[in-house]
Amino acid sequence: GKFSVFGKILRSIAKVFKGVGKVRKQFKTASDLDKNQ
């Protein structure tokens, strides 16, 4: 029981980190494009 809850928490944290990574990548690309213009 406890372990499945822990797994769920870890999975949701991993999801958040993935989402943040994606957003940061897009943001960096956008700022790079901004510099080039």
Curated annotation (Swiss-Prot):
Protein name: M-oxotoxin-Ot2a
Biological processes per GO annotation: defense response to bacterium; symbiont-mediated hemolysis of host erythrocyte
Keyword entries, A-Z: Antibiotic, Antimicrobial, Cytolysis, Hemolysis, Secreted, Toxin
Known tissue expression: Expressed by the venom gland.
Record's function text: Disrupts biological membranes, particularly those rich in phosphocholine. Has antimicrobial activity against Gram-negative bacterium E.coli, Gram-positive bacteria B.subtilis and S.aureus, and hemolytic activity against sheep, pig and guinea pig red blood cells. Has insecticidal activity against S.frugiperda ovarian cells by opening non-selective ion channels. Enhances the insecticidal activity of spider venom neurotoxic peptides.
Family according to the record: Belongs to the cationic peptide 02 (oxyopinin-2) family.
GO CC annotations on file: extracellular region
Originating organism: Oxyopes takobius (Lynx spider)
